[in-house]
From Swiss-Prot:
The lineage of its organism: Bacteria, Pseudomonadati, Campylobacterota, Epsilonproteobacteria, Campylobacterales. Homodimer. Keywords: Chaperone, Cytoplasm, Stress response. The gene is grpE. Residues 1-30 are annotated as: Disordered. This is Protein GrpE. It comes from Campylobacter jejuni subsp. jejuni serotype O:6 (strain 81116 / NCTC 11828). One of its GO terms (biological process) is protein folding.
Length: 176
């Protein structure tokens, strides 16, 4: 019986050792799975934070470019009154040589002024046949045989924009 007992104890020891190895392996597997999960979560957080950082960088760059493009908007808008005055001076009829020379000088000044405005992104809004509330300001409506309803009849004051932003709409009369 002692041999059986010895054999039984040996078998128990082997089973116990095997179970311990198996338990240890299970613990290692569980730990490895937990670590992998933690790693995956941290990697995901890193990727999201990195993507958010890149988006912030792009947005800041876009805002910077926009601020630069529109920085002179208020100043340019104020200069439009000067432009209107120069254009009005050009439209005055001249009857003597001195007045013609002055008008020529004003025209040269106006041309230079327009080039400088254009250099800084200020552009004349092109005349459109159809009324566009994004570009035009209707001052009044008129009956017109030559125009369809909603068409621009007369430009009363030129409009200007910087890039795609209107700084002064074109003031127009519109056909009824």
């Amino acid at each position: 019986m002692s041999e059986q007992k010895q054999e039984f104890e040996n078998e128990n020891a082997e089973n116990s050792e095997h179970l311990q190895d198996e338990n240890l392996q299970n613990i290692e597997d569980v730990e490895q799975n937990r670590l992998q999960k933690d790693y995956d979560e941290l990697k995901d957080k890193y990727m999201r934070a990195n993507a958010e950082f890149e988006n912030i960088k792009k947005r800041m760059e876009k805002e910077k470019l926009s601020a630069m493009a529109y920085a002179n908007e208020s100043f340019a808008k104020d200069l439009l009154d000067v432009l209107d005055a120069l254009e009005a001076a050009i439209n005055v009829e001249c009857h003597d040589e001195i007045s013609l020379k002055i008008k020529e000088g004003v025209q040269n000044t106006l041309d230079l002024f327009l080039k400088k405005l254009e250099k800084h992104g200020v552009a004349l809004i092109k005349e459109e046949k159809e009324f566009d509330p994004n570009l035009h300001e209707a001052m009044f409506h008129v009956d017109s045989q030559n125009h369809q309803s909603g068409e621009v009849v007369t430009v009363l004051q030129k409009g200007y924009k910087i890039a795609d932003r209107v700084i002064r709409p074109t003031k127009v009369s519109v056909a009824k």
